[in-house]
Amino acid sequence: MATTTGLTEVVLYDTLVNYLISMARLVEGAMNRALDAIVSFESERTASLPGEVFLLEPRINEMEIVIDEHAVRLLRRGSFTEDETRLIVAALKITNDLERIGDIAVNIAERVVSLRDMTQAQTPEELAPMAEAVRSMVSRSLGALIFRNAELAAQVLECDDIVDQYGDRIFEHLLQRMTKDVSRVTPDLQFVLATRHLERIADHATNIAEDIIFWVRGLDVRHGRGLALLPEQQQEDVVVRRTADVTDNSSALYSGVTPSCETQRV
């Protein structure tokens, strides 16, 4: 009987992790479509992507509810090991950040719909590499979740400042452009909002990475605490491939872009 009970508990906790991974894949799929759409909003190849993002939102919201209910079911079981407690706490927080990334993907898709009707709209030069840096952060967070890899999660924390720097430079460029040509104010404000959306996705990816480190290592690295306690990166790195639902045109659209925070080896 004890063995059966133990096996049941293992299955329940593995199910929670699998639910998280499933939700993360949906969210990354929505985000990738939104990023492809905003960077190449004029292309006919990306015209259908905003609609696909809108269709994914209810599925993401449903997964949030499923995970919350499953976590509550685990909490009702009573006693937990330290690892199990950290997993439940991290899962509830990660789910919230994933749901917010899904919402932001919808916000970006809405910007794209508006921009496609604006003749003066012109994509800022650094928006593509900024989007790639954000894409990489979310991809690494998903990889860290799948492989329970604290070192990969720590790499995400290092990228947040780079995304903020892109956002600051794009804002300055757009401000100068709007000052010189008032006809660009309406479309450029859409891009200002889009860069803010990207920064928020990066913030949520950072939160997820911090929660994964807490779950795997028991370290609270929020606000820079305890990060020095993480071990150095292993000598021989292994490429982490993105297994998420990436849009087909992503590689073609960005084949010439070298992001500052690209997917690395762990």
Mark where each language-model region is:
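Cytosolic, long alpha-helical scaffolding segments
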Residues: 1-266
